[in-house]
UniProtKB/Swiss-Prot annotation:
Single GO cellular component term: cytosol
The gene coding this protein: mnmG
Name of this protein: tRNA uridine 5-carboxymethylaminomethyl modification enzyme MnmG
Organism encoding this protein: Acinetobacter baylyi (strain ATCC 33305 / BD413 / ADP1)
Subunit structure: Homodimer. Heterotetramer of two MnmE and two MnmG subunits.
Known function: NAD-binding protein involved in the addition of a carboxymethylaminomethyl (cmnm) group at the wobble position (U34) of certain tRNAs, forming tRNA-cmnm(5)s(2)U34.
């Protein structure tokens, strides 16, 4: 059958990339079709039941700032919220939400089903209609042809997916779901650069068989943070604790004894796994000097006893999984509900993409998510939104858009993928961003919401809330700048009494806030401020980090001017503070002549280039003084 409706955008896949892609295109007014093999699994959390974390929550906030669904779904489904790196600087603070799988998925599905311009159809895609070098349509498993102007492919782990438990293997996109074999073959016919990656998941545990009394409870933060700029604590369901236990030498001996039946260590799995989320087999091999590893027992939801033991992802045979689980303190009688497994799947070298996530070989075909070599819901969602908005703009012959590295973590993600490529699953960290003080969680809306509004991604309600917030920030900052505390006036005396700090001369409330040990809550109490916590936090960060932020803006401008800066032939990379051993060795081997050349060396990060630039500048200043 030839379906009568012609779409602007067709999105294949209903995971985290696909849902954000479809929602973005539909919000922009494009006629959009989301093809999924199973409507019941839209927005499903296939691995760990959590959203956010270091580097990742920055992406979630950026998705949210552009009108995406992930952050609000996390607020509606989150059963524990924590601020990570809370004692560190604002640039690296991150929000993490432990999610109820069912509630999160329900929130995503509700958003999809209530989005104007978006049709959903349950059917696997088997073929792409390509005429010349341009995609024109999609053919489903039962032979239905859908015509479209653009296609966004978000296949996750389904392309040629193979599940491994011990030396047994079976076809699957994830446990219980079939793989996408026909589409995998079709993409290989298009001569796109394909490779294999792998990821894994731990066995799931019945909480009723666990002794929590010997474990360390890990409660959420109070007051509870929110993930979305539009979020509110009232959205949160009941909050619960996670629990921490550890592996031990007995656990490690059991694992070592099973390595001869491990698909990873017998060469059965060829795909490369995620470096920063290794299996327990990898951990005891790579960190042989450690006699224990943390295991976080995370509830899968409020209406289930199922636990996710974060830290023991494995593809060992089930009998070994059974023994290793029961060797862990508090889990001596644990009942496994589902075995852990590894999954191997196709991905395509992201260097074959444009910065808009459109393939270079096939016009109007966009890739997003794990198909590009990334790992993580947040990385997938960010790519999905970018691919969706660019497919939507291409459908109406509008200019494509990708944020720069100094504008968003999304920009860092895309630039890393396209410039460097990847041979292992790519995960976002704050350390990948050289301008991270400018790319904080709290200001994602300032950086991106106005851009999103221009492109039609941000609705009236979100835009009004953003404008109200920014007006409050501006008004309150101006108010505090005109409130003065002096040693002998009431405000000054109250400040000294309240904080125990010295006050030797007159200064504004803004100047008081600049002090290291003074926070906005104290200033609010002192001055009678009525603004929200979100507004207060934004003001405090802007005030305290003003000098550093201004310096980083200067660095952005200077790095652009100095892209062709010469590196002295005898430059000593060993004196560059903060440069990793791996990057130092690469620079010593290649000996780049310019910063631009250094930037192009695979594995040399923009942050490393900036460190080299700063050292060159310091050396030049030292020579001038001498």
């Amino acid at each position: 059958m030839h379906y009568p409706k012609v779409y602007d955008v067709i999105v294949i896949g209903g995971g985290h990339a696909g849902t954000e892609a479809a929602l973005a295109a539909a919000r922009m007014g494009r006629q959009t079709l989301l093809l999924t093999h199973n409507i019941e699994t839209l927005g499903q959390m296939s691995c760990n039941p959590a959203i956010g974390g270091i580097g990742k929550s920055h992406l979630v906030r950026e998705i949210d700032a552009l009108g995406g669904a992930m952050a609000l779904a996390a607020d509606k489904g989150g059963i524990q919220f924590r601020i990570l790196n809370s004692r560190k600087g604002a640039a690296v603070r991150a929000t993490r939400a432990q999610a109820d799988r069912v509630r999160y998925k329900a929130a995503i599905r509700h958003t999809l089903e209530n989005q104007a311009n978006l049709d959903i159809f349950q059917q696997a895609a088997d073929d792409l209609i390509v005429e010349g070098d341009t995609v024109k349509g999609v053919v489903t498993q039962m032979g239905i042809r859908f015509d479209t102007k653009t296609v966004v492919l978000t296949t996750g782990t389904f392309l040629g997916g193979v599940i491994h438990i011990g030396l047994e293997k079976s076809s699957g996109g994830r446990a219980g779901d079939p793989p996408s074999i026909a589409l995998s073959h079709r993409l290989r016919e298009l001569n796109l650069p394909v490779g294999r990656l792998k990821t894994g998941t731990p066995p799931r545990i019945d909480a009723r068989s666990v002794d929590f009394s010997v474990m360390t409870p890990q409660p959420g933060d109070f007051p509870s943070p929110v993930m979305s700029f539009m979020g509110d604590v009232s959205m949160h369901p009941e909050q619960v604790s996670c629990y921490i236990t550890h592996t031990n030498e007995k656990t490690h001996d059991i694992i070592r004894g099973g390595l001869d039946r491990s698909p990873m260590y017998t060469g059965v799995i060829e795909g490369v796994g995620p470096r920063y989320c290794p299996s327990i087999e990898d951990k005891i091999h790579r960190f042989a000097d450690k006699d224990s590893h943390q295991v976080f027992l995370e509830p899968e939801g409020l209406d289930t006893h199922e636990l996710y033991p974060n830290g023991i992802s494995t593809s060992l045979p089930f009998d070994v999984q059974f023994e290793l689980v029961r060797s862990i303190r508090g889990m001596e009688n644990a009942h496994i509900l589902r075995p852990g497994y590894a999954i191997e799947y196709d991905y395509f070298n992201p260097q074959a993409l444009k910065f808009t996530l459109e393939t270079k070989a096939i016009n109007n075909l966009y890739f997003a998510g794990q198909i590009n070599g990334t790992t993580g819901y947040e990385e997938a969602g960010a790519q999905g939104l970018l691919a969706g908005l660019n497919a939507a703009r291409r459908a109406w012959d509008q200019e494509q858009w990708t944020p720069k590295r100094d504008q968003a973590y999304m920009g860092v993600l895309v630039d890393d993928l396209i410039t460097l490529g990847t041979k292992e699953p790519y995960r976002m960290f704050t350390s990948r961003a050289e301008y991270r003080l400018m790319l904080r969680e709290d200001n994602a809306d300032q950086r991106l919401t106005p851009v999103g509004r221009e492109m039609g991604l941000v609705d009236d309600v979100r835009w009004a809330a953003y404008c109200e917030k920014m007006e409050a920030v501006e008004t309150e900052t101006a108010r505090l700048a005109h409130l003065w505390a002096a040693p002998n006036n009431p405000m000054g005396k109250q400040f000294v009494e309240m904080t125990g700090a010295d006050l030797s001369k007159e200064c504004s409330a803004i100047d008081l806030l600049k002090r290291p040990n003074i926070n906005f809550t104290q200033i609010a109490e002192l001055t009678g401020s009525q603004v929200s916590t979100q507004v207060g936090d934004q003001i405090e960060i802007a005030v305290k980090y003003e000098g550093y932020i201004n310096r980083q803006h200067e660095d952005v401008a200077q790095l652009k001017r100095l892209e062709e800066t010469k590196i002295p032939a005898d430059f000593d990379y060993d004196i560059v503070s903060g440069l990793s051993r791996e990057i130092t060795q690469k620079l010593k081997t290649v000996r780049p002549e310019t910063l631009a050349q250094a930037h192009r060396i695979p594995g040399v990060t923009p942050a490393a280039v900036q460190l080299v630039m700063i050292t060159i500048r310091k050396n030049a200043q030292t020579k001038k003084i001498a």
